[in-house]
Structure formats: C-alpha cells, structure tokens
Amino acid sequence: ITMNTLNQQYEEKVRPCIDLIDSLRSLGVEKDLALPAIAVIGDQSSGKSSVLEALSGVALPRGSGIVTRCPLELKMKRRQEGEEWYGKISYQDCEKEIEDPADVEKKIRDAQDEMAGVGVGISDDLISLEIASPDVPDLTLIDLPGIARVAVKGQPENIGDQIKRLIQKFIKRQETISLVVVPCNVDIATTEALKMAQEVDPDGERTLGILTKPDLVDKGTEETVVDIVHNEVIPLKKGYMIVRCRGQKDITDKVSLTEAIEREKAFFNDHVHFQTLYNDGHATVPKLAEKLTLELVHHIE
C-alpha cells in the first residue's frame, strides 16, 4: 500500500496549508513570519537518511560520517494516480529540474559540495528538493546534519559545535516540530539529539520520537523498546513511532522502496514483541507519514 491510505479529507485540508507555507517560504516571508516546519535530527548513523528516503521514495546520500552537510528541505507533494514523477533541486541562485528519481542522490551531493566545499565542511545554506509523485505524502521536512561526537580527519575541531549550532537554530523556533531519530540498539536517554530537543522543548510539546533499526535491538531489551514507544519512559506529547527502513544490506541486495514497505509490514506483523506496536498504529513508515501530516496540520491550526 502506498501513501494513498491518507484520508481524502486531510488531503483537502492539508494540501492548501502546505502549499501556502511553501509559497510564503519561497517568497522569503520566513524572516518576519515564523512558518511551521518539521526538522529531522539524530545522532550520526541513527538511520535518519533511511527514514527520509522511505518517506520520499528517493535515495538520498547516506553512508558513515557526515552525510547531510547542509540543511535539506524536502518538499513532497502528492500527485494524482497516474501522474508523472517530478523533481526539482534549488540552492543559492541555482534551480535544476530532475528527470529521473535515480539522479536525486548525485544532485544533492553536487549541491552540498558546491555549498559546503568538497569533502568535510558543513554549511548553513538550505538546499531545497521538491518531489511530486502519487507515492509521497504531502509534507515538508527539513533534514539537518547528524550530530557528530568527534571530528574526523580534515574536519574542523569544532565540527560538533558547528552542527549543534545549526540544529539549534532550527529547532529552537516554537513553530518547529522536532523529529528525533533514535536507533533501537542504543540507550535513548543518552542520545544527543533527544537532549538537544529537550533543551529547547523541555515539556516535549513539539517533539516526536522515531525509533529505527528494530531488527538490531539487543536481545532482552525488546520490552523496553515497547515501553518507550508507549510513551512510558521519556514521555513526549507527540509520542513515538517505530519504523524499519532499508539497511545497507537491503540496498546492496537492490531491495526497492516499495518492497521495503512490504518487508517492514511483515517484520512488525510477525514480531513477538513489536506486533502490538503495529496493531496500535505506532509502527511502519506509511503510519509515520500519516501521523506527520496530521501533526503538521494541528501545529498550523
């Protein structure tokens, strides 16, 4: 099932809101009027890019180390069944249409190299990627660089602070919903991304947690993960979702995004511990897409 499960009524309510926000943002109204946005943050290797990739249906730059080197605004617009896929990338004074979904990753890498320098720096400038297709939800997300603990060769010593400063700039605004991506195989309480979200949003009013990599969960900690998603460990007003996206092996094995959604559903459906989360509507990427769209609308209202 693609995103077509999103109710028509939200389609009618959501689309006008999102179009309005996008056009205001492109007119530069941002400066005087704070527009609602969803910012995606996570420690490095949290599975952030995989979540965005699953939502957008296109491959984004991924790998170890700093992959997202500039803020990437991902504008997704849902098209009618049968309509063509459309893509466009804009940054600085440059705007290019993208013919083929397979070219997106390279175009983003080129744009990042142009803006942040080839290699290892980061930049505050926004790259905007617009995608229209029958298979995406109506959503605009801003992907921010992963939080790095230590600088690698060639990076400025203070790269960690630079990234934090950049993230802070986005998430401290009251209009921003922070999407905090945390893998199931780490202790959520120690993740830097959640700490940062808590600093700017102590009551968890506008923070939503996403747990990734449930297939890598340490044996014996599954029930803790269930408790986290049930909002019983670190409560957030917007709660938690759990997803399983393509890992490196799936990509090597050429598992398509559509196939990955089927596999994800089967994974949760058959999982002794996580099945309840699936039944409660707390699991899978399509459910996440639905929740994000609703959250954005509530936030706008």
Swiss-Prot record:
What the record says about the induction of its expression is:
By interferons.
Pfam hit, one: Dynamin_M
- Region G4 motif: what ranges? 212-215
Q: Which UniProt keywords apply?
A: Cytoplasm, GTP-binding, Nucleotide-binding
User: InterPro entries recorded for this chain?
Assistant: Dynamin, Dynamin_GTPase, Dynamin_GTPase_CS, Dynamin_N, Dynamin_stalk, G_DYNAMIN_dom, P-loop_NTPase
- Mind telling me which PROSITE patterns this protein's record contains? G_DYNAMIN_1 (PS00410), G_DYNAMIN_2 (PS51718)
Which terms does the UniProt entry file under GO BP?
defense response to virus; receptor internalization; synaptic vesicle budding from presynaptic endocytic zone membrane
Compartments reported by the entry: Cytoplasm
Keyword Membrane in the entry? The reply is: no
Q: Where is this region: G5 motif?
A: 244-247
In this chain, GTP is annotated as bound at: 42-49, 143-147, 212-215
Any signal peptide, and if so, which residues?
none
Please give the residue ranges the record annotates as the region G2 motif: 67-69
- According to the record, the residues making up region (G1 motif) are 42-49
Q: Where is it found, in Gene Ontology cellular component terms?
A: cytoplasm; microtubule; nucleus; plasma membrane; presynapse
List every stretch annotated G3 motif: 143-146
- Domain Dynamin-type G, by residue range, is 32-301
Kindly indicate whether the keyword Nucleotide-binding belongs to this entry.
yes
GO: which molecular function terms? GTP binding; GTPase activity; microtubule binding
Query: What family, per the record?
Result: Belongs to the TRAFAC class dynamin-like GTPase superfamily. Dynamin/Fzo/YdjA family.
* Official protein name in the record: Interferon-induced GTP-binding protein Mx
